[in-house]
Amino acid sequence: MRAYPLSIAPVDDDRPFFFRYSSWRELGGLFSADPVMRARVPPMERSVVALLIVIGAAALLCVQLPLRLLSRRPPRPRRHAAFFAGLGLGYMAVEIALLQRFGLFLGHPNYALSVVLASLLMASGLGALHAPRVVGALGGIRFVAYAVCGLILAETLLAFPLLPRLLTLPFAARAGLTFLLVLPIGVGLGAFLPTGLEALKRDTPEAVPWAWGVNGVFSVLAPVLSVAFSITWGMRALLLAAVPIYLVAALSYPASEPASRA
């Protein structure tokens, strides 16, 4: 089966891409001198590559150019870049995975879009509004990341397998349970960005727009990467992938900057 040119793996709820039968190995045809090989590359794979190229070019233009024009380079730019890029990638990975997971539980993607997105945005807003309290209560931005990662693991491994047993509940009860499961994760996710921006503002205020741009670029890049990732490994793996992303981002947070004062 691995040597077969087409993807014939069974479709399930974790990888609901019944329209996708091609393999990423066919991307090599894009660089072939044979026009027949180039024409065989499926449209979806072409689209992913095209989007990555366009967004990558925009990142170089909109992020790196302003950074070079700054009169003073921000300290430890790589660590700051890893932190804000990780926030953009991780947030969108969590959001997309939760939308798909709760779409099954709520019965329709539109319900998931309404309930999950509203819950996540409201919880993130609360986390951003009360970021100093959240970060201070947990003892620092890194401990917020540890808590968020623990919640993601607990819900993925313990809570989500139980959701099919609750499909007979009324819609209001399922929506309420969705809100309760999304709320703590969203509050933690919302505390990261304002904390990082506030710390950067104290140290290098002129680098704040650059950091915002890094986060924005990777937030736009993340959906494309998330689709490619989930098609290959599934939505469950996409949600779990947010764990190392946030851990790396938290470890990239400069230890000399007091997170609890954000």
Please annotate each region the language model reported.
Residues 1-262:
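Alpha-helical transmembrane segments of multi-pass membrane proteins
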